[in-house]
């Protein structure tokens, strides 16, 4: 009897041989990877390996020197960041980028802007349907803050007054506000204590099923990476040196050398 293998999960994003050159420096050199739907894929590597440059290309902040980036069947290689966001890609940054003088709720409402119908004129005139949309957006923001574990009291506080771990939660809620198909997280546990990191790890593992999205993760904490990732891509000096399931990557001699140095 012939056993048919289950069909492969479709890729929400496909990266094909992307290169980014700044002057004479190759920051990313011919990297390819697939991000399946409802999966968690991690990109790891030493500082300066090209991870954030890769993220910036995937979100439209940088244009690749060569190669292709496909979101589903659509080529977004040269698309503007707002177009990429509108197609369902959201991200957080290594350095938190919240508006400190706005409340946590207001910060998350900004993340919903791409899904709102009111334009400039509507926001000025504010007819009844615009006011209704604003109320719905605020309710949605509060729901997301509760979902990421922020208390109702903290939702009303200025973002700049919140503890670091709570600011991270607000940033993730803001990214989720755009209803992404793909969420890019850049060092989400940076600066967190072990308890906060463990809580965020558990939260990330729930996201693909609960929100129907895929996650592409940059993270230096190997406990987090090995605990949540289905596949890992390893970069060193802009080149992909390894790829595969966590156990395979962890035992790869090239990965060990990149992180620990060549052993005599």
Where are these regions (language model features)?
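Glycine-rich phosphate-binding loops of nucleotide-dependent enzymes
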Residues: 2-264
């Amino acid at each position: 009897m012939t056993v048919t293998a289950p069909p492969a999960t479709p890729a929400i994003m496909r990266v094909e041989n992307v290169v980014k050159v700044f002057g004479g420096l190759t920051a990313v050199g011919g990297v390819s990877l697939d991000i399946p739907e409802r999966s968690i894929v991690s990109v790891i590597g030493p500082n300066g390996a090209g991870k954030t440059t890769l993220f910036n290309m995937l979100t439209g902040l940088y244009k690749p020197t060569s190669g292709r980036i496909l979101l589903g069947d659509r080529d977004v290689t040269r698309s503007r960041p707002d177009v990429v966001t509108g197609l369902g890609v959201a991200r957080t940054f290594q350095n938190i980028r919240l508006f400190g003088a706005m409340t946590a709720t207001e910060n998350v409402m900004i993340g919903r802007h791409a899904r709102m119908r009111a334009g400039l004129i509507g926001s000025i005139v504010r007819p009844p349907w615009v006011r209704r949309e604003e109320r719905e957006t605020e309710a949605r923001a509060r729901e997301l803050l509760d979902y990421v574990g922020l208390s109702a009291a903290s939702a009303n506080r200025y973002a700049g007054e919140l503890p670091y771990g709570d600011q991270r939660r607000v940033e993730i809620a803001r990214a989720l506000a755009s209803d992404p198909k793909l969420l890019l997280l850049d060092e989400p546990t940076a600066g967190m204590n072990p308890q906060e990191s463990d809580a965020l790890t558990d939260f990330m593992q729930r996201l693909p099923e609960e929100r129907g999205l895929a996650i592409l993760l940059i993270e230096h904490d190997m406990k987090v990476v090995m605990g949540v990732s289905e596949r890992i891509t390893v970069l060193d000096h802009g080149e992909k040196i390894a790829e595969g399931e966590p156990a395979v990557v962890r035992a790869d001699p090239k990965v060990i050398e990149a992180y620990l140095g060549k052993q005599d």
